[in-house]
From Swiss-Prot:
Residues 291-542 form the Glutamine amidotransferase type-1 domain. It comes from Klebsiella pneumoniae (strain 342). NCBIfam families: PRK05380.1, PyrG. This is CTP synthase. One of its GO terms (cellular component) is cytosol. It holds the Pfam family GATase. Homotetramer. GO terms for biological process: 'de novo' CTP biosynthetic process; pyrimidine nucleobase biosynthetic process.
Length: 545
């Protein structure tokens, strides 16, 4: 089986939406029956985004096999059925780390280690390994053409096109076509210069995706085709849309998938986008709306909670309601009080790290519990709910997590010091361990209590969800908390760790240690988010009476 590669680059400016465009194209190709995957190559020197600030980089998306990756992999999984793995994302830092390790080991037999061929070869090896077993692999190169950091990646994909053959490789370039209001027309010059930059590296794009706030007229696309040496039918207009889930249909309507299949000599049926049309219909025809407050510490950059925001929207689709998300800084709860939480139909506290704003989250959990407002806590959101319950119901005054107060009297949340990794090896950690790559990561089994709400929502006794955390419920202090009325609704497969808690005498109060947002998709949704949004709708109706 021959694997075909589509290399996706971006020019003129960053944040054009390469990830969404690549994922949308992959969705169309998948709908044609092709086995598709997507890779993201990030030019930064961090080994992975695990220790990067969410305010700078956005969320860290965790794959099933426990890799901490770029948020674009979340888009990929929401658009196609293929599950991403650690093979689907790597950085300059990872490549250099691998090459330097080999050099120290003597693998290069005394050769002078250079960017070409050693770094470029390492990049090519990883791309080829990630593409094994697939009909089509889309490879997104992070950053913008012209960035010094991207050069080794661009050189590597240039070489791959020569080595694999142009009949099995395509270069797809996203570029900005700005509209100039004063002139009353779109301008193609930035695109021409961007392609010129690519040509100087030795890459002739085969497809141009023209990003604009409006449809690019046919005459302007013809002009771009002429000056950039690309067939007219391969110049695609990609205008701004009110829903990213419309993009597969937009690309298909311009024949992009037909062009690619013809170039790769692939014989496959027409794409059936009925599932995406259903998503668009549900999104455009809600029967109501709810307002959900998300209380966190990184709210100045919504991308820090990208998967949570998308999962809430998916929950809305499953209930035919529009979900309005109100982002609330947990420090504002500390300074202004819980008054700012009024007029919400439900409250969600997502994951996070560090002490800043934690007391505001604890106050938020208490407000939701005492006022019967639907509550969903994720990761840290579960831990603050547990701390709040321990303090205010179980009588454990000043209960806390050792992450925030190491010597507190009631450490109801504590560091996980030992667990097994995906290979079955025992991992041991302490407070002095490195921050990078030292968490409980990836898919883990969870056994659900038969009497629990989550058992009803999931409809099965055992589930698998993804984790990213260092701290867990302290089993030594669990009994008095359970005696006070808290239900442990889910435990790890080995019965050692608390994964889900509920407040039984509350209409809907669920908190989980894992990250359900990572497995929610627009077509399938997720049981927790669907149930949470439904609870928000029911709360709204009760309040209206």
């Amino acid at each position: 089986m021959t694997t075909n590669y589509i290399f996706v680059t971006g020019g003129v400016v960053s944040s054009l939406g390469k990830g969404i465009a690549a994922a949308s194209l992959a969705a169309i190709l998948e709908a044609r029956g092709l086995n598709v995957t997507i890779m993201k190559l990030d030019p930064y020197i961090n080994v992975d985004p695990g220790t990067m600030s969410p305010i700078q980089h956005g969320e860290v998306f965790v794959t099933e096999d426990g890799a901490e990756t770029d948020l674009d992999l979340g888009h990929y999984e929401r658009f196609i059925r293929t599950k991403m793995t650690r093979r689907n994302n790597f950085t300059t830092g990872r490549i250099y780390s691998d090459v330097l390790r080999k050099e120290r080991r003597g693998d290069y037999l005394g050769a002078t280690v250079q960017v070409i061929p050693h770094i470029t070869n390492a990049i090519k090896e990883r791309v080829l390994a990630g593409g094994e077993g697939h009909d089509v692999v889309l490879v997104e190169i992070g950053g913008t053409v012209g960035d010094i950091e991207s050069l080794p990646f661009l050189e590597a994909i240039r070489q791959m096109a020569v080595e694999i053959g142009r009949e099995h490789t395509l270069f797809m370039h996203l570029t900005l076509v700005p509209y100039m209001a004063a002139a009353g027309e779109v301008k193609t010059k930035p695109t021409q210069h961007s392609v010129k930059e690519l040509l100087s590296i030795g890459i002739q794009p085969d497809i141009l995706i023209c990003r604009s706030d409006r449809a690019v007229p046919a005459n302007e696309r013809a002009k771009i085709a002429l000056f950039c040496n690309v067939p007219e039918k391969a110049v695609i207009s990609l205008k701004d849309v009110d829903s990213i889930y419309k993009i597969p249909g937009l690309l298909k309507s311009q024949g992009l998938d037909d062009y690619i299949c013809k170039r790769f000599s692939l014989t496959c049926p027409e794409a059936n986008l009925a599932e995406w049309e259903q998503v668009i219909y549900e999104e455009a025809n809600p029967a109501g709306e709810v307002t959900i407050g998300m209380v966190g510490k990184y709210i100045e950059l919504p991308d820090a909670y990208k998967s949570v925001i998308e999962a809430l929207k998916h929950g809305g689709l499953k209930n035919r309601v529009t979900v309005n998300i109100k982002l609330i800084d947990s420090q504002d709860v500390e300074t202004r009080g819980v008054e700012i939480l009024k007029d919400l139909d439900a409250i969600l506290i997502p994951g996070g790290f560090g002490y800043r704003g934690v007391e505001g989250k604890i106050a938020t959990a208490r407000y939701a519990r005492e006022n019967n407002i639907p509550y969903l806590g994720i990761c840290l959101g579960m831990q603050v709910a547990l701390i709040e319950f321990a303090r205010n119901v179980a009588g454990m005054e000043n209960a806390n997590s050792t992450e925030f107060v190491p010597d507190c009297k009631y450490p109801v949340v504590a560091l996980i010091t030992e667990w097994r990794d995906e290979d079955g090896n025992v991992e041991v950690r302490s407070e002095k361990s490195d921050l990078g790559g030292t968490m409980r990561l990836g898919a883990q089994q969870c056994q659900l209590d038969d009497e629990s709400l989550v058992r009803q929502l999931y409809g099965e006794p055992t589930i698998t969800e993804r984790h990213r955390h260092r701290y867990e419920v302290n089993n030594m202090l669990l009994k008095p908390i359970e005696a006070a009325g808290l239900r442990v609704a889910g435990r790890s497969g080995d019965d050692q760790l608390v994964e889900i808690i509920e407040v039984p005498n509350h209409p809907w109060f669920v908190a989980c240690q894992f990250h359900p947002e990572f497995t929610s998709t627009p077509r399938d949704g997720h049981p927790l988010f669907a149930g949470f949004v439904k609870a928000a709708s029911e709360y709204q109706k009760r309040q209206a009476k």
